[in-house]
Swiss-Prot record:
Matches recorded under SUPFAM superfamilies: S-adenosyl-L-methionine-dependent methyltransferases
Lineage: superkingdom: Eukaryota
Annotated catalytic residues: 333
Species name: Papaver bracteatum
GO molecular function: (S)-tetrahydroprotoberberine N-methyltransferase activity
Protein's UniProt name: (S)-tetrahydroprotoberberine N-methyltransferase 1
Subunit text: Homodimer.
């Protein structure tokens, strides 16, 4: 009997209430989360190829009628402004908050972070002496990796988080890197006449909606010789917004505020080639993401008391608020494991595409 049949009927509010009170043990939480993703699969898979294609094309067409981005400011405040000391306690040495790449079973999180950065550089065809723009650069791990490995490159990170800009510039100074810049801006509002040899976007395009407008904007920062490398989480067959699939879906809205995240299909970006054209296309098995989030959760659990102490001052000394943040992050990690390990990593995964300017 599958988990859909095993989960007792309960309203979304009741489930969230129990979760935030600490009344749901991990084993039950795993079942509750898996139940939501099984419902998503039932929602997304259609009975015939024709119906599936029509469903997918309707989604693509709907994106082209939307604003360029989702609720970026909401996402920024709720997810990306955590203290750097907290992030360092949970993530690996480069504080990478996206998929890490495990070359072998015994790989550590630090090795997997570096392997992911290496993979990006290989597939984006990074070469020494290039100008590189990392859009949605996070804490700047990839920016710093490129700046250290390719010393003649000039690498710029763009983020709408002041905390991330400060962290990146501080790390660059510590490492004595003079080939690093950071831009504080919302990419959808940022205007520049500057062009770059390579544009990178790692797990950030998920916060965009109208990809036709967005890819057009990115193309203005490219020359005829430039390449754009995009890495995004995806489902292998269908796209969906990370929003409630029905009224009993407590999970989706808890993890991401409504309107903040779009999960594309593995081939969705192929429908947005008005201003760029695809050069290459890969997928990475979801187990790499599943292992990443599982290691993050274990690190949080191991450093729980210290992590809570770090969070406390920024949350007005409220232990309830601290518990809320920690519960959110643990649930995100547990959910990510269930999502990306489904069907041995062959349902939700990571797509990578390389584009040139048209």
């Amino acid at each position: 009997m599958g988990s859909i049949d095993e989960v007792k009927k309960e309203s979304a509010g009741e489930t969230l209430g129990r979760l935030l009170k600490g009344e749901i043990k991990d084993e039950e939480l795993k079942k509750l989360i898996k139940f939501q993703f099984e419902k998503r699969l039932q929602w997304g898979y259609k009975s015939s190829h024709q119906e599936q294609l029509s469903f997918n094309l309707d989604f693509i067409k709907s994106l082209k009628k939307m604003e360029m981005s989702g609720e970026i400011e909401t996402m920024n405040k709720e997810t990306y402004e955590l203290p750097s000391e907290f992030l360092e306690a949970v993530f690996g040495k480069t504080v990478k908050q996206s998929m890490c790449y495990f070359k072998h079973e015994s790989a550590t999180i630090d090795e997997a972070e570096e392997a992911a950065h290496e993979l990006y550089c290989e597939r984006a065809q990074i070469k020494d002496g290039q100008t590189v723009l990392d859009i949605g650069c996070g804490q700047g791990g990839l920016v710093l990796y490129i700046a250290r490995k390719y010393k003649k490159c000039h690498v710029t990170g763009l983020t709408n988080s002041k905390a991330q800009v400060n962290y990146l510039l501080k790390q660059a100074e510590k490492l004595g890197l003079t080939n690093v810049d950071a831009i504080l801006a919302d990419v959808t509002q940022y205007e520049s006449d500057k062009t770059y040899d390579r544009l990178l976007m790692i797990e950030a395009i998920e916060h965009m909606k109208n990809l036709q407008l967005f890819m057009k904007k990115l193309s203005t920062w490219m020359t005829e010789e430039s390449l754009l490398f995009v890495d995004h989480v995806c489902h292998k067959t269908f796209a969906h917004f990370f929003e409630a699939v029905d009224e009993d879906d407590w999970y989706s809205g808890f993890i991401f505020p409504p309107g903040c995240a779009t999960i594309l299909a593995a081939n969705s970006l192929l429908y947005f080639q008005d201003d760029v054209s695809v050069v290459d296309h890969w997928v990475v098995n979801g187990m790499h993401m599943a292992r990443s989030v599982d290691i993050w959760r274990k690190a949080l659990d191991k450093n729980m008391e210290a992590a809570k102490e770090i969070l406390l001052p920024g949350l007005g000394g409220s232990h309830e608020a601290v518990n809320g943040v920690v519960t959110h992050i643990r649930t995100f990690c547990m959910g990510g494991y269930e999502q990306f390990s489904m069907n041995d990593g062959d349902e939700w995964m990571v797509a990578q595409l390389l584009f040139k300017k048209k």
